[in-house]
Amino acid sequence: MDFQLQAVDKHARAGILNLVHSQVETPIFMPVGTQGCIKSLDAIDMQERLSAKLILANTYHMYLRPGEKVIEQLGGLHHFAQFHGSFLTDSGGFQAFSLSDNVKLQEDGIVFKSHLDGSKHFFTPTKVLDIQYSLNSDIMMVLDDLVGLPAPLKRLEESIKRSAKWANISLEYHKENNRPNNNLFAIIQGGTHLKMRSLSVGLTHGGFDGYAIGGLAVGESTNEMLETIAHTAPLLPKDKPRYLMGVGTPENILDAISLGVDMFDCVMPTRNARNATLFTHSGKISIKNAPYKLDNTPIEENCTCYTCKRYSKAYLHHLFRAKELTYARLASLHNLHFYLELVKNARNAILEKRFLSFKKEFLERYTMDRQ
Protein backbone atom coordinates (compact mmCIF):
# COMPACT_ATOMS: atom_id res chain seq x y z
CA MET A 1 0.00 0.00 0.00
CA ASP A 2 1.24 3.44 -0.88
CA PHE A 3 0.25 6.45 1.24
CA GLN A 4 1.31 9.89 0.08
CA LEU A 5 0.93 13.01 2.19
CA GLN A 6 -0.01 15.92 -0.07
CA ALA A 7 -0.46 18.73 2.43
CA VAL A 8 -0.35 19.49 6.15
CA ASP A 9 -2.20 22.48 7.64
CA LYS A 10 -1.13 22.80 11.29
CA HIS A 11 -1.77 19.15 12.23
CA ALA A 12 -4.53 18.43 9.69
CA ARG A 13 -3.40 16.18 6.83
CA ALA A 14 -4.49 15.56 3.24
CA GLY A 15 -3.19 12.52 1.42
CA ILE A 16 -3.70 9.78 -1.15
CA LEU A 17 -4.14 6.13 -0.18
CA ASN A 18 -3.41 3.83 -3.13
CA LEU A 19 -5.18 0.49 -2.74
CA VAL A 20 -5.48 -2.24 -5.34
CA HIS A 21 -9.21 -1.57 -5.91
CA SER A 22 -9.27 2.23 -5.59
CA GLN A 23 -7.36 5.42 -4.98
CA VAL A 24 -8.66 6.99 -1.78
CA GLU A 25 -8.31 10.67 -0.93
CA THR A 26 -7.89 11.44 2.75
CA PRO A 27 -9.36 12.54 5.09
CA ILE A 28 -11.90 9.83 4.32
CA PHE A 29 -15.16 8.75 5.93
CA MET A 30 -16.00 5.06 5.49
CA PRO A 31 -19.69 4.08 5.44
CA VAL A 32 -20.33 1.00 7.58
CA GLY A 33 -21.58 -2.08 5.73
CA THR A 34 -21.69 -4.59 8.57
CA GLN A 35 -23.11 -7.48 6.53
CA GLY A 36 -21.24 -6.61 3.33
CA CYS A 37 -23.67 -3.84 2.36
CA ILE A 38 -24.77 -0.47 3.66
CA LYS A 39 -28.25 -0.98 5.10
CA SER A 40 -30.90 -0.18 2.41
CA LEU A 41 -28.26 0.72 -0.23
CA ASP A 42 -26.60 -1.27 -3.01
CA ALA A 43 -23.29 -1.02 -4.84
CA ILE A 44 -24.69 1.30 -7.50
CA ASP A 45 -25.84 3.71 -4.79
CA MET A 46 -22.39 3.63 -3.23
CA GLN A 47 -20.43 3.99 -6.46
CA GLU A 48 -22.55 6.21 -8.68
CA ARG A 49 -24.69 8.22 -6.27
CA LEU A 50 -22.18 8.65 -3.44
CA SER A 51 -18.82 8.06 -5.17
CA ALA A 52 -17.69 6.05 -2.14
CA LYS A 53 -14.21 4.59 -2.55
CA LEU A 54 -13.79 2.70 0.72
CA ILE A 55 -16.40 1.05 2.93
CA LEU A 56 -16.23 -1.07 6.07
CA ALA A 57 -17.49 -4.63 6.49
CA ASN A 58 -17.46 -6.76 9.61
CA THR A 59 -15.34 -9.89 9.89
CA TYR A 60 -17.43 -11.39 12.72
CA HIS A 61 -20.68 -11.17 10.77
CA MET A 62 -19.18 -12.30 7.44
CA TYR A 63 -17.55 -15.26 9.20
CA LEU A 64 -20.78 -16.43 10.84
CA ARG A 65 -23.01 -15.74 7.82
CA PRO A 66 -22.59 -16.68 5.00
CA GLY A 67 -19.06 -17.78 5.96
CA GLU A 68 -15.74 -16.55 4.65
CA LYS A 69 -15.16 -19.70 2.58
CA VAL A 70 -18.48 -19.19 0.80
CA ILE A 71 -17.46 -15.63 -0.06
CA GLU A 72 -14.02 -16.82 -1.19
CA GLN A 73 -15.57 -19.43 -3.51
CA LEU A 74 -17.79 -16.70 -4.97
CA GLY A 75 -14.82 -14.50 -5.86
CA GLY A 76 -14.20 -12.53 -2.69
CA LEU A 77 -16.12 -9.74 -1.02
CA HIS A 78 -15.78 -7.26 -3.90
CA HIS A 79 -17.30 -9.63 -6.45
CA PHE A 80 -19.85 -10.96 -3.95
CA ALA A 81 -21.14 -7.43 -3.20
CA GLN A 82 -20.45 -6.10 -6.71
CA PHE A 83 -18.68 -3.13 -5.14
CA HIS A 84 -15.73 -2.03 -7.23
CA GLY A 85 -14.16 0.19 -4.59
CA SER A 86 -12.19 -1.01 -1.57
CA PHE A 87 -13.16 -2.79 1.65
CA LEU A 88 -11.76 -2.35 5.14
CA THR A 89 -12.71 -5.19 7.47
CA ASP A 90 -12.42 -5.01 11.24
CA SER A 91 -11.22 -8.02 13.18
CA GLY A 92 -14.57 -8.94 14.71
CA GLY A 93 -13.23 -8.89 18.25
CA PHE A 94 -15.55 -6.12 19.41
CA GLN A 95 -18.62 -7.99 18.11
CA ALA A 96 -17.43 -11.23 19.71
CA PHE A 97 -17.42 -9.42 23.06
CA SER A 98 -20.55 -7.32 22.64
CA LEU A 99 -22.92 -9.74 20.89
CA SER A 100 -22.02 -13.08 22.43
CA ASP A 101 -22.81 -14.76 25.73
CA ASN A 102 -20.15 -16.45 27.86
CA VAL A 103 -17.19 -14.78 26.17
CA LYS A 104 -13.82 -15.97 27.47
CA LEU A 105 -10.72 -13.88 26.95
CA GLN A 106 -7.58 -15.99 26.76
CA GLU A 107 -3.93 -15.09 26.20
CA ASP A 108 -4.04 -16.56 22.69
CA GLY A 109 -7.51 -15.42 21.60
CA ILE A 110 -11.23 -15.02 22.29
CA VAL A 111 -13.71 -17.86 22.85
CA PHE A 112 -17.29 -16.88 22.08
CA LYS A 113 -20.67 -18.23 21.10
CA SER A 114 -22.46 -17.19 17.93
CA HIS A 115 -25.35 -14.81 18.53
CA LEU A 116 -27.14 -16.62 15.69
CA ASP A 117 -27.18 -20.25 16.84
CA GLY A 118 -25.09 -20.49 20.00
CA SER A 119 -22.28 -22.43 18.32
CA LYS A 120 -18.83 -22.09 19.89
CA HIS A 121 -15.95 -20.32 18.10
CA PHE A 122 -12.38 -19.27 18.77
CA PHE A 123 -10.78 -16.14 17.30
CA THR A 124 -6.99 -15.93 17.37
CA PRO A 125 -4.75 -13.27 15.79
CA THR A 126 -3.95 -15.57 12.86
CA LYS A 127 -7.51 -16.92 12.53
CA VAL A 128 -8.98 -13.45 11.94
CA LEU A 129 -6.31 -12.76 9.31
CA ASP A 130 -7.16 -16.01 7.52
CA ILE A 131 -10.81 -14.95 7.48
CA GLN A 132 -9.90 -11.55 6.07
CA TYR A 133 -7.62 -13.15 3.45
CA SER A 134 -10.62 -15.19 2.30
CA LEU A 135 -12.70 -12.02 2.10
CA ASN A 136 -9.80 -10.40 0.16
CA SER A 137 -10.01 -7.22 2.22
CA ASP A 138 -8.00 -4.23 1.04
CA ILE A 139 -7.35 -3.22 4.65
CA MET A 140 -7.40 -5.73 7.51
CA MET A 141 -7.51 -4.96 11.21
CA VAL A 142 -5.64 -7.00 13.81
CA LEU A 143 -7.45 -8.72 16.65
CA ASP A 144 -7.33 -6.55 19.77
CA ASP A 145 -8.51 -6.56 23.37
CA LEU A 146 -11.00 -3.70 23.65
CA VAL A 147 -11.87 -2.34 27.09
CA GLY A 148 -15.00 -0.34 27.88
CA LEU A 149 -14.54 2.87 29.84
CA PRO A 150 -14.10 3.66 32.65
CA ALA A 151 -11.71 0.79 33.40
CA PRO A 152 -9.17 0.06 36.17
CA LEU A 153 -5.55 0.82 35.31
CA LYS A 154 -4.61 -2.85 35.70
CA ARG A 155 -7.21 -3.88 33.11
CA LEU A 156 -5.97 -1.19 30.69
CA GLU A 157 -2.41 -2.44 31.07
CA GLU A 158 -3.52 -6.02 30.40
CA SER A 159 -5.39 -4.82 27.33
CA ILE A 160 -2.51 -2.94 25.75
CA LYS A 161 0.00 -5.72 26.38
CA ARG A 162 -2.34 -8.35 24.97
CA SER A 163 -3.32 -6.15 22.00
CA ALA A 164 0.33 -5.40 21.20
CA LYS A 165 1.24 -9.09 21.48
CA TRP A 166 -1.58 -10.06 19.13
CA ALA A 167 -0.69 -7.26 16.71
CA ASN A 168 2.93 -8.37 16.53
CA ILE A 169 1.91 -12.01 16.01
CA SER A 170 -0.39 -10.82 13.21
CA LEU A 171 2.38 -8.81 11.56
CA GLU A 172 4.80 -11.75 11.49
CA TYR A 173 2.08 -14.06 10.14
CA HIS A 174 1.17 -11.51 7.48
CA LYS A 175 4.79 -11.23 6.36
CA GLU A 176 4.99 -15.02 6.04
CA ASN A 177 1.87 -15.06 3.84
CA ASN A 178 3.20 -12.41 1.42
CA ARG A 179 -0.17 -10.78 0.62
CA PRO A 180 0.80 -7.27 -0.56
CA ASN A 181 -2.75 -6.40 -1.69
CA ASN A 182 -4.17 -7.10 1.79
CA ASN A 183 -2.88 -4.30 3.99
CA LEU A 184 -2.61 -4.70 7.76
CA PHE A 185 -3.36 -2.02 10.36
CA ALA A 186 -2.38 -2.17 14.04
CA ILE A 187 -4.69 -0.86 16.78
CA ILE A 188 -3.48 1.32 19.66
CA GLN A 189 -5.33 0.87 22.96
CA GLY A 190 -5.03 2.38 26.45
CA GLY A 191 -8.37 4.04 27.16
CA THR A 192 -7.99 7.70 28.11
CA HIS A 193 -4.84 7.05 30.15
CA LEU A 194 -2.13 8.88 28.22
CA LYS A 195 0.78 6.89 29.62
CA MET A 196 -1.00 3.69 28.64
CA ARG A 197 -1.45 5.05 25.11
CA SER A 198 2.27 5.81 24.90
CA LEU A 199 3.07 2.32 26.17
CA SER A 200 0.73 0.78 23.59
CA VAL A 201 2.52 2.60 20.77
CA GLY A 202 5.89 1.56 22.15
CA LEU A 203 4.93 -2.11 22.43
CA THR A 204 3.50 -2.29 18.90
CA HIS A 205 6.14 -3.06 16.29
CA GLY A 206 6.75 -0.87 13.26
CA GLY A 207 6.08 -2.19 9.78
CA PHE A 208 2.28 -2.03 9.72
CA ASP A 209 0.60 -0.41 6.73
CA GLY A 210 -1.41 1.89 8.99
CA TYR A 211 -2.32 2.53 12.60
CA ALA A 212 -5.72 2.83 14.27
CA ILE A 213 -6.63 4.60 17.48
CA GLY A 214 -9.09 2.20 19.08
CA GLY A 215 -10.96 2.04 22.35
CA LEU A 216 -12.65 5.44 22.14
CA ALA A 217 -16.31 6.48 21.92
CA VAL A 218 -16.99 3.74 24.50
CA GLY A 219 -18.12 5.84 27.47
CA GLU A 220 -15.59 8.63 27.88
CA SER A 221 -16.38 12.36 27.58
CA THR A 222 -15.70 14.28 24.37
CA ASN A 223 -12.91 16.22 26.08
CA GLU A 224 -11.27 12.98 27.23
CA MET A 225 -11.54 11.54 23.74
CA LEU A 226 -9.96 14.60 22.09
CA GLU A 227 -7.19 14.78 24.68
CA THR A 228 -6.39 11.13 23.99
CA ILE A 229 -6.31 11.67 20.22
CA ALA A 230 -4.13 14.78 20.61
CA HIS A 231 -1.66 12.74 22.65
CA THR A 232 -1.68 9.58 20.53
CA ALA A 233 -1.72 10.79 16.91
CA PRO A 234 1.74 12.47 17.01
CA LEU A 235 3.25 9.23 18.35
CA LEU A 236 2.24 7.35 15.19
CA PRO A 237 4.41 7.22 12.03
CA LYS A 238 3.93 10.34 9.92
CA ASP A 239 4.13 8.38 6.66
CA LYS A 240 1.29 5.97 7.54
CA PRO A 241 -2.48 6.56 7.58
CA ARG A 242 -4.12 7.12 10.97
CA TYR A 243 -7.58 5.68 11.57
CA LEU A 244 -9.93 6.69 14.40
CA MET A 245 -12.29 3.76 14.89
CA GLY A 246 -16.03 4.24 15.37
CA VAL A 247 -16.10 8.06 15.53
CA GLY A 248 -18.43 9.87 15.12
CA THR A 249 -20.35 13.13 14.92
CA PRO A 250 -19.49 15.84 12.37
CA GLU A 251 -17.94 17.86 15.21
CA ASN A 252 -15.86 14.87 16.36
CA ILE A 253 -14.59 14.23 12.85
CA LEU A 254 -13.48 17.82 12.27
CA ASP A 255 -11.82 17.94 15.69
CA ALA A 256 -9.97 14.70 14.97
CA ILE A 257 -8.88 15.90 11.52
CA SER A 258 -7.41 18.98 13.19
CA LEU A 259 -5.41 16.60 15.42
CA GLY A 260 -3.93 14.63 12.52
CA VAL A 261 -6.38 11.76 11.89
CA ASP A 262 -6.96 10.57 8.30
CA MET A 263 -9.68 7.90 8.39
CA PHE A 264 -13.07 7.53 10.09
CA ASP A 265 -16.04 5.16 10.24
CA CYS A 266 -19.33 5.33 12.09
CA VAL A 267 -22.87 3.96 11.82
CA MET A 268 -24.26 7.36 12.82
CA PRO A 269 -25.29 8.73 9.40
CA THR A 270 -27.21 5.60 8.38
CA ARG A 271 -28.58 4.67 11.81
CA ASN A 272 -29.76 8.23 12.39
CA ALA A 273 -31.30 8.30 8.92
CA ARG A 274 -33.36 5.20 9.62
CA ASN A 275 -34.53 6.79 12.88
CA ALA A 276 -35.74 10.03 11.25
CA THR A 277 -32.70 12.22 12.00
CA LEU A 278 -31.22 13.99 8.98
CA PHE A 279 -28.05 16.09 8.85
CA THR A 280 -27.92 19.61 7.43
CA HIS A 281 -25.32 22.37 7.60
CA SER A 282 -27.60 24.14 10.09
CA GLY A 283 -27.82 21.12 12.36
CA LYS A 284 -29.94 17.99 12.56
CA ILE A 285 -33.66 17.79 11.85
CA SER A 286 -36.21 15.14 12.83
CA ILE A 287 -38.20 14.45 9.67
CA LYS A 288 -40.98 12.71 11.62
CA ASN A 289 -42.07 15.99 13.22
CA ALA A 290 -45.40 17.53 12.22
CA PRO A 291 -44.06 20.79 10.68
CA TYR A 292 -42.61 18.80 7.76
CA LYS A 293 -45.96 17.36 6.69
CA LEU A 294 -46.54 20.24 4.26
CA ASP A 295 -42.91 21.25 3.67
CA ASN A 296 -42.32 21.11 -0.08
CA THR A 297 -38.61 21.98 0.12
CA PRO A 298 -35.67 19.54 0.03
CA ILE A 299 -33.90 18.45 3.20
CA GLU A 300 -31.35 21.17 2.50
CA GLU A 301 -31.31 23.88 -0.16
CA ASN A 302 -28.33 23.57 -2.53
CA CYS A 303 -27.63 19.98 -1.46
CA THR A 304 -26.64 17.97 -4.54
CA CYS A 305 -27.48 14.52 -3.18
CA TYR A 306 -29.80 12.16 -5.07
CA THR A 307 -32.58 12.68 -2.53
CA CYS A 308 -32.52 16.47 -2.30
CA LYS A 309 -32.52 16.87 -6.08
CA ARG A 310 -35.75 14.88 -6.33
CA TYR A 311 -37.82 14.79 -3.15
CA SER A 312 -39.32 17.10 -0.55
CA LYS A 313 -39.26 16.92 3.21
CA ALA A 314 -43.03 16.37 3.04
CA TYR A 315 -42.53 13.22 0.96
CA LEU A 316 -39.85 11.89 3.31
CA HIS A 317 -42.08 12.71 6.30
CA HIS A 318 -44.85 10.68 4.66
CA LEU A 319 -42.57 7.73 3.86
CA PHE A 320 -41.26 7.60 7.42
CA ARG A 321 -44.75 7.81 8.94
CA ALA A 322 -45.98 5.12 6.53
CA LYS A 323 -42.98 2.92 7.41
CA GLU A 324 -42.06 2.54 3.75
CA LEU A 325 -38.71 0.85 3.08
CA THR A 326 -37.88 3.49 0.47
CA TYR A 327 -37.57 6.05 3.25
CA ALA A 328 -34.45 4.38 4.70
CA ARG A 329 -32.74 4.44 1.32
CA LEU A 330 -33.48 8.08 0.52
CA ALA A 331 -32.59 9.25 4.03
CA SER A 332 -29.37 7.21 4.10
CA LEU A 333 -28.31 8.58 0.71
CA HIS A 334 -28.66 12.12 2.05
CA ASN A 335 -26.87 11.55 5.35
CA LEU A 336 -23.97 9.69 3.75
CA HIS A 337 -23.67 12.41 1.12
CA PHE A 338 -23.47 14.96 3.94
CA TYR A 339 -20.66 13.05 5.68
CA LEU A 340 -18.70 12.36 2.50
CA GLU A 341 -18.98 15.99 1.41
CA LEU A 342 -17.86 17.10 4.87
CA VAL A 343 -14.54 15.26 4.64
CA LYS A 344 -14.13 16.22 0.98
CA ASN A 345 -14.53 19.90 1.85
CA ALA A 346 -12.19 19.47 4.82
CA ARG A 347 -9.60 17.97 2.47
CA ASN A 348 -9.90 20.87 0.04
CA ALA A 349 -9.49 23.31 2.93
CA ILE A 350 -6.31 21.52 4.05
CA LEU A 351 -4.89 21.65 0.53
CA GLU A 352 -5.60 25.40 0.47
CA LYS A 353 -4.18 25.94 4.00
CA ARG A 354 -7.48 27.21 5.41
CA PHE A 355 -8.70 24.24 7.45
CA LEU A 356 -9.11 26.03 10.78
CA SER A 357 -11.25 28.76 9.25
CA PHE A 358 -13.30 26.12 7.38
CA LYS A 359 -13.85 24.20 10.62
CA LYS A 360 -14.80 27.35 12.53
CA GLU A 361 -17.32 28.45 9.89
CA PHE A 362 -18.85 24.98 9.63
CA LEU A 363 -19.27 24.56 13.39
CA GLU A 364 -20.68 28.06 13.88
CA ARG A 365 -23.45 27.32 11.41
CA TYR A 366 -23.96 23.68 12.36
CA THR A 367 -24.40 24.40 16.06
CA MET A 368 -26.28 27.70 15.83
CA ASP A 369 -29.65 26.07 16.54
CA ARG A 370 -28.32 24.96 19.94
CA GLN A 371 -27.45 28.45 21.16
From Swiss-Prot:
NCBIfam families: Q_tRNA_tgt (TIGR00430), tgt_general (TIGR00449). The gene is tgt. Zn(2+) binds at C303, C305, C308, H334. Substrate binds at D90, S91, G92, G93, F94, D144, Q189, G215. It holds the Pfam family TGT. Keywords: Glycosyltransferase, Metal-binding, Queuosine biosynthesis, Transferase, tRNA processing, Zinc. One of its GO terms (cellular component) is cytosol. Transmembrane segments: none annotated. GO terms for molecular function: metal ion binding; tRNA-guanosine(34) queuine transglycosylase activity. Its cofactor is Zn(2+). Residues 246-252, 270-274 are annotated as: RNA binding. It comes from the Bacteria. Catalyzes the base-exchange of a guanine (G) residue with the queuine precursor 7-aminomethyl-7-deazaguanine (PreQ1) at position 34 (anticodon wobble position) in tRNAs with GU(N) anticodons (tRNA-Asp, -Asn, -His and -Tyr). Catalysis occurs through a double-displacement mechanism. The nucleophile active site attacks the C1' of nucleotide 34 to detach the guanine base from the RNA, forming a covalent enzyme-RNA intermediate. The proton acceptor active site deprotonates the incoming PreQ1, allowing a nucleophilic attack on the C1' of the ribose to form the product. Binds 1 zinc ion per subunit. GO terms for biological process: queuosine biosynthetic process; tRNA-guanine transglycosylation. This is Queuine tRNA-ribosyltransferase. Homodimer. Within each dimer, one monomer is responsible for RNA recognition and catalysis, while the other monomer binds to the replacement base PreQ1. Belongs to the queuine tRNA-ribosyltransferase family. Pathway: tRNA modification; tRNA-queuosine biosynthesis. Its EC number is 2.4.2.29. InterPro entries: TGT, TGT-like_sf, tRNA_ribo_trans-like. The active site is at D90 (proton acceptor), D265 (nucleophile).
